[in-house]
């Protein structure tokens, strides 16, 4: 993310990218992990609470290496939220809800950012303020990243929350589950290679763009959009 902005050499774009990266690392990622912790707590598991993860403090959720990678290239990770599914009131559905909470927080936050952008754009269209246009660009940038991470995490493949959601619908003793657990290290390497080469990013970006357009349309409705 920052690397792409630096390559443009445009000061305003670089400033917006720096602000968006900081917002992503210190707001979006902590909210994602907090959502997992909150959902687990609501399902009866006090593991996140006892681990100090039921908080929005970035220090509890940001992984140093993952945070740096997110800022630089737009892909990384936070500290995994510890949960014990055995404590859930309903183990199967509890796992689904807890896994879905993280990506859902990213999508809802992205929608909120797009709504704020729509408000600022409506005001700037009247006043013609360059500062307001820059603020709108920042929120659009932040929304794009947040929604991209939400869609990415919903992929039903190992390493992402989408896989844990899918697991909740697979029968116990499923061959698919067993195969994934036996080959998870190899799968992680393959997925990381696909992400860093951009092969996996293209379809995720296309789906994210569809979600962004839908949320942008909803956000513009109050202003006659």
Model-based region annotation:
Residues 1-225:
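Hydrophobic transmembrane alpha-helices and their immediate loop junctions
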